[in-house]
Amino acid sequence: MKKIITILLFILISNSIWASFIYVPMSYDNQKNHLKAYGIVYFGLEAGLKSKWLLNYDGGAFLIENNKAIENECKIRGVSYQIISDAKAQLILQEI
């Protein structure tokens, strides 16, 4: 039983290890500076990262390959973002 609890805690704590995408919402409610958000996507593309534009989802949100530099730029520029798992990204893509 102790082993199972340890494994479950490890999975919950290390969720960011398996996260493979940075989700940048573009809806009015979730993003305060849209121009800076587009700049983040451009920054990622210039760095050679793959991005997906989710035209009909959350105001035209973006999925960018998870990268620490992109995450840091989002923090510096004040861009709203979420780290999501590959499974959640696939669910979003299927919904579109």
What are the residue ranges of the model-derived segments?
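Intrinsic-disorder/low-complexity accessory segments
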Residues: 20-96
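Sec-dependent N-terminal signal peptides
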Residues: 4-16
